[in-house]
């Protein structure tokens, strides 16, 4: 007994023994134990489910009657003898018939049950039917199924004995407290039935009163939450419950107000960090009261924020699917207004809370709405995405947005609006790592390798070193500042996804409406493209130009993209893109002469990249040919485009001073100018003159006249023929924007017509002699004496 007990007795493991057991083994043991407990509980639930199913099947099953057995001749004779032995003289005919009917039905009672012979000689089915019927459980009075709570099992000699108890039922008072709104809604539904009919004025007053009460309630809840979010976090649920307003009079307005109020509340109370779920160890650990209160606040905030986003998403889905709810509080016509408010709230949360939880869910919800058929909804979503991409400094939100857009473009087979891809032009990507792959851009490890640890450290030191490295990693993750390496890595990955979108469209959807947006995007990010793709990309762009399937603007974008590629890293490549110069030279005359011409902006960008920035690769004949063609084009353009073209000509004459030969009036040269030739190198531009400047000198726009006079003098930078500072320091693009006629305005303003006032001549002093004029004025100012006349006296009186 002694040795056996010593063998069975487990020794307490030493500290060295515990060190040998790795954390991985301990975690595996814990997982196995939890798996066994879950499997045993799962088996119990499965058996209970089978039992409940069998009982429910029997309760719904109709019982089959017994088969009628054929009577043997002996039984028939006994029944006849029994009927004859009855005292029929003492019974009425009705009683006799009733007894005979009972006797016919009592064949089961009068049959000889001791006989083993089959009732039907040929059929053995009746035996099986009888056995199945007897085995079928009887219908019993069913009790309500009670939910069981599984407790810890008890261990016995035979094994584990599972324990369970019935879940206590909450009293009815608590249920009434949890759902007080339902009774209020029911009362409100019952009141209109008994209420008398109201006039339209009374209905309007009643609605205004209800709406004012709801507004005050929303304001009170919002103010309480903002005053102390940690204490009043439970009021978020009450405010969110008002999203389900059922009063048809004020339902739409109240829901809109609650949506906007919740959006503003969340923007104010959401912390500046992402809330992660607690682990099991953190939940089991004892913490301070303040920490516990903070955890409750964070859990409540995340849950209510999640429910709020789900409500917004469901509102938009109901509007898109035109789904009617059970409660007719909101009609289908009003769902559009509700959905627009919901989309606006989603857009605001996307821009205001890019760091908080469920931001990726908001992106997934919002990106399909960018391609919505409703113009207002699409514009709201696109503007929100542009704001997010412009203000994203790290690049994490931009990467998530670009990935979702890429998936949508591919899933919809490139049938989306161009405005969706135009949003990608707002990406803030200035620096990427083009030499290494995305995996190589990760920061180098600062920790010791396994071989170094094993060589230099003991086992205990390795344990301590491992714990120290783990702590350092956690501290690095907790830092708020983002490293430059991480930023470059995110930007590189984002740019890879963007180029993947562009190259897919160039390869598979060259006739799509997205081609213009793709070419514009390639022109912006061309300096970040890897050198390996340059030859293939230039070949694709030239094939697109020569195919004839592109519009004028798309062909200009192709030219601009190709020169952006060649002006960046393409400087190391010895390529002369003469075919692109020839195409632009040929298509310059197709610029639209009337209306707001937005193609002029792209033309000015092309001239800047092709002639100014590549001045060393451009020949003098090519520059002179473009100068002559641009002056010809300027004759039939609007003032804003004409000013931009003349500013580009000034830039050409200053970059290539020998172009002043076109200002000479010599009639002889080494050939004849061929304006109809499409190749600028061989059209003999040195044998012509810029006679268009004489016509532009008398243009109705004053700025055009200034530029024409300036160019006729050779575009000097100093002297009498130089331009003013306000014109000479601006680029052609800036001048085009400043003098734009897009808003139907004229810059400088047109002078008004001269005033046509009548000239009145005043009469001054007519006499030169001052004394004479004074006497005349004095005589005119004297009042004449009034004399009384007497007509009764004789008119004449004779003198003696």
Curated annotation (Swiss-Prot):
GO cellular-component term (any): nucleolus
Primary location recorded for the protein, binned into one broad class: nucleus
GO molecular function: chromatin binding
Residue ranges, compositional bias (Polar residues): 789-800
Source species, domain of life: Eukaryota
Cellular compartment(s): Nucleus, Nucleolus
Stretch list, region Disordered: 1-91, 167-197, 780-800
GO BP: any one term: muscle organ development
Residue runs in coiled coils: 449-490
One Pfam family of this chain: NOC3p
Signal peptide (from-to): none
Key words, A-Z: Coiled coil, Nucleus
Biased composition (Basic and acidic residues): 65-74
UniProt record similarity statement: Belongs to the CBF/MAK21 family.
Name of this chain's protein: Nucleolar complex protein 3 homolog
Biological source species: Danio rerio
Gene: noc3l
